[in-house]
Swiss-Prot record:
The chain crosses the membrane at residues 114-134. The lineage of its organism: Bacteria, Bacillati, Actinomycetota, Actinomycetes, Mycobacteriales. One of its GO terms (cellular component) is membrane. Keywords: Membrane, Signal, Transmembrane, Transmembrane helix. This is Uncharacterized protein Rv2599. It comes from Mycobacterium tuberculosis (strain ATCC 25618 / H37Rv). InterPro entries: DUF4247 (IPR025341).
Length: 143
């Protein structure tokens, strides 16, 4: 192989490596909160979180969100779907007159330091049995 051809191969490999690196970083840094903000219309915002309007059933919308980014935990209770991500709790369900609302709450808003006892069934482990009142959090000890 000639010297110029080797430079061309090396350059091509460098470009391919850079594209792979950027693609990998992009895929690893998916953020469900940003996805929701860019795909759904914001209905309201308060100190505890942001609400977005959605169409379809809560289960369908939650499944769409799970396809974008897999949550650490998923549970449902009646018509509401709960998705726990590394930094957010996402709740999808009816709210007031709205048949489908997505609520995004940052974990630092209170979940991390025990401000909320019940996050819907299926979120385990529950709070310690020696905690307030001596009973595990949530029904069946799930938190």
């Amino acid at each position: 192989m000639s010297r110029n051809r080797l430079f061309l191969v090396a350059g091509s490999l460098a470009v391919a490596a850079a594209v792979s690196l950027i693609s990998g970083i992009t895929l690893l840094n998916r953020d469900v909160g940003s996805y929701i903000a860019s795909h759904y219309r914001q209905e309201s915002r308060d100190v505890n979180g942001t609400r977005y309007l959605c169409t379809g059933s809560p289960k369908q919308v939650a499944t769409t969100l799970v396809k974008y980014q897999t949550p650490a935990a998923r549970a449902s209770h009646t018509d509401t779907e709960y998705l726990r991500y590394r930094n957010n709790i996402v709740t999808v369900g009816p709210d007031g007159t709205y048949p489908c609302i997505i609520r995004v709450e940052n974990l630092s808003a209170g979940y991390n330091h025990g401000a909320y006892v019940f996050l819907g069934p299926g979120f385990t482990p529950g709070s310690p049995s020696g905690g307030s009142g001596g009973s595990p959090g949530g029904p069946g000890g799930s938190k």
